[in-house]
Amino acid sequence: MSEENKKWLVVVNPKASVGKSGKDWPEIRQILVNEGIEFDEMITEYPRHAIEIVRNAIVEQGYRKFISVGGDGTNNEVINGIFTQDVVPTNDITMATMPVGTGNDWRRNFDIPMEYDEVAKIIKAGHVFVHDIGKLTYYNDGDTQIRYFLNAAGTGLDEMVCHSTNLMKKQGKGGTIRYLISLVKCILTYKITHIQIEIDGKQVFDDGILSVSVGNCRFNGGGMMTMPKAVPDDGLLDVTVIKKVSIFKFAANVKNLYDGTFINKINEVLTFRGKHIRITSIPPHSLMVETEGENLNNSPFDFEMLPRSINMVIPKEPVKKEKKKKKTLQEIRLSISPPSKQTTIKQLNKSTTKHTSS
């Protein structure tokens, strides 16, 4: 194991947010320099490269602090680089994020701003939150695979929308509209899948589903509050199940997905919580899963929580943004109306008095 390197290692995914991350990196670099943050940088060149970079940086180069520049997918790769090495305890490692683009669901849980200069100040301050990490075991052509996640995972419609969205990304189409278009297309074509869910060894669900989300944070899918009661340091995974529901009912409640109220407004929504979650599909291997925007392979899926296992840099207090005070209708009228005769006389009297006294 190498001697500890005190600098941050900035891992930049230049293709995040349809290339915005790479385009903005020179600006972000200068902001970090201006803030007095000492760092080295590495640019990813292909999918999952960040996993290799981070793992090697810990084991061979002694880095203990990482800044992820990109979106939730980049964060996920950095997390997997940290958790797929066994040389340095993950509790000794600190991670910060510099969110780029429109998704960035993890940062919403902690009110991390999108302004680069504000994020740099947060990183400089160094306030950390000891965060839980999810561990997912799934199957790829019969082989067991493991993937770690910071925020959330999903299957059913969730995974299908993720797949469609990623195809649109490759075509250079980005943003929230991209996600909503994918959502509508997938709702119209999705086929209900029968699953069974076990939580801490007890079967709690055996029915058809539209979608299932599993995670330790509240937001998923570009700002949707799919797990509104999730707490990222309670050692538990939250599960939200949307059963078979009519297209019209689901469409009528899409807006409620963004504030979390859908769990109380749609009878077909169930929520659970536990340390170990197992999802089995009928027939076997008929479902795929996604974690933070990356499509993975087949069921069954086993989820477990690694409690309080990494230090994440967050604001000590929410960043306050000054809002311009809105003028009242009376103030607007006064600002555009000519002065009245009485007002003009008063101003003249004041002026005369001033000149006389001087």
Placement of each model-derived feature along the sequence:
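ATP/nucleoside-binding phosphotransfer catalytic cores, i.e., glycine-rich phosphate-binding loops
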Residues: 199-201, 206, 226, 231-232, ...
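Glycine-rich phosphate/pyrophosphate-binding beta-alpha loops
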Residues: 154, 158, 213-227, 295
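Catalytic core of DAGKc-family lipid kinases
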Residues: 35, 44, 84-210
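ATP/NTP phosphate-donor binding region
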Residues: 1-69, 80, 117, 319, ...
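Short amphipathic alpha-helical segments
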Residues: 22-24, 79-82, 108-110, 225-226
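Short gly/pro-enriched beta-turn/loop segments at secondary-structure junctions
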Residues: 3-6, 129, 144-145, 188-192, ...
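Short glycine/serine/threonine-rich phosphate/pyrophosphate-binding segments
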Residues: 50, 73-78, 105, 131
